[in-house]
């Protein structure tokens, strides 16, 4: 049971979903604290 669950967690779609959720949360929180950081007017 535990081995199958760990094997499921290590599949590519699950890892991709977890990684994209983490990245999105990081960008959203950075944008909340520093709102003008996401674009650089050059």
Curated annotation (Swiss-Prot):
Origin: domain of life: Eukaryota
Entry GO CC: chloroplast thylakoid membrane; photosystem I
Keywords for this protein: Chloroplast, Membrane, Photosynthesis, Photosystem I, Plastid, Thylakoid, Transmembrane, Transmembrane helix
Cellular location(s): Plastid, Chloroplast thylakoid membrane
Main location per the UniProt record: plastid
GO BP: any one term: photosynthesis
Pfam families from the UniProt entry: PSI_PsaJ (PF01701)
Biological role: May help in the organization of the PsaE and PsaF subunits.
This protein's name: Photosystem I reaction center subunit IX
